[in-house]
Regions:
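Periplasmic polypeptide-binding modules associated with outer-membrane biogenesis and secretion
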Residues: 1-92, 122, 127
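Transmembrane beta-strand segments of outer-membrane beta-barrel domains in Gram-negative
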Residues: 16-19, 29, 83, 134-271
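Transmembrane beta-strand segments that form the barrel wall of outer-membrane beta-barrel proteins
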Residues: 28, 60-61, 82-92, 102-103, ...
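Hydrophobic, well-ordered secondary-structure elements that form the walls
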Residues: 48, 105, 148
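Secondary-structure transition/capping motifs at alpha-helix termini
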Residues: 50-55, 76-82, 107-116, 155-156, ...
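Short glycine/serine/proline-enriched coil/turn segments at secondary-structure junctions
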Residues: 64-67, 93-96, 111-113, 182-183
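Amphipathic hydrophobic-ligand
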Residues: 97-101, 249-251
Length: 271
């Protein structure tokens, strides 16, 4: 029988506990004055293991000199919250050479609840060959992506027992992409809010795309490209012409998958 969880001690560079007490409580399934349970021990390890802010967890028990009681100590070692990475790239698209650079910033514990903030900046340049009749032969692309992921459901009216039973994430994401090609200029702005979770058995997985918006804006199309490909009113170019118009696409989706070794089931609904 566990008498008390004596204390929770975090070991990091600053010797400070970086997680809120509520986060620790919600991810601890061992109970004070409750019976020792191997299932609850494994579940506690699993829950702390999925937190981005946690590097590793160690749970130990000490027998008390009186009765059949234990003290439980949970030690948490946290990751460094901030990381920055820089990555140069070389590109080769159908023989056209180019270069790209990528800068990524991550914060694994933004609000002291193991929230993951990711900001990704990317710039690319490519010299395009084989084009005739255009003012330039350069392709430029600049992309900014940002996402914030919570290791839990961010939604009202959910019972605490349901929140503790499942492994869930809530994610909001934004992206802006700027493309300048010799044939056209394109801007893409997108945003999404989604939930993902799986039940305790890990066989069932769910995803709800509560909101998924994509806006495509074409500020400029060269006269030659329009004349060669878009002004033809035949059915052959109808789909091609649609791809170079301003578009606003909104989507709601639900995905379900079941996987148990020998067989799997997948279902997807979008509207």
């Amino acid at each position: 029988k566990i008498n008390t969880i004596n204390y929770i001690n975090a070991e990091d560079n600053n010797s400070k506990l970086g997680l809120r007490s509520k986060v620790l409580k919600n991810n601890t399934f061992l109970k004070e004055d409750g019976y020792y349970s191997l299932k609850d021990l494994r579940k506690t390890y699993e829950r702390f293991g999925r937190l981005q802010a946690v590097k590793y967890t160690n749970i130990s028990f000490r027998e008390l000199p009186y009765g059949e009681q234990l003290d439980c100590d949970i030690y948490i070692n946290t990751n460094k919250p901030n990381t920055i990475s820089f990555q140069p790239e070389g590109t080769n698209t159908a023989g056209d050479l180019g270069a790209a650079v990528r800068l990524e910033y991550m914060n694994r514990n933004l609000f002291k609840g193991s929230e993951l903030l990711s900001i990704d900046l990317r710039g690319a340049y490519e010299a395009i060959t084989g084009l005739e009749g255009y003012n330039n032969d350069n392709f430029e692309e600049y992309t900014v992506q940002a996402s914030l992921m919570f290791p839990r459901f961010i939604a009202p009216f959910l019972a605490r027992s349901f929140r503790r039973r499942i492994n869930a994430t809530s994610e909001v994401a934004l992206m802006y992409d700027l493309q300048n090609r010799p044939e056209y200029h394109r801007r893409v702005l997108s945003g999404a809010w989604r939930y993902k979770w799986n039940d305790a058995n890990h066989h069932d997985r769910y995803q709800i795309d509560l909101l998924d918006i994509n806006y495509v804006f074409m500020p400029w199309i060269s006269d030659k490209f329009r004349e060669d490909y878009l002004d033809d009113n035949t059915n052959r170019n109808a789909i091609l012409r649609y791809n170079y118009e301003d578009l606003l696409i909104m989507k709601f989706g639900f995905r379900y998958s079941y996987n148990k070794g020998l067989y799997a089931i997948r279902a997807n609904i979008e509207t």
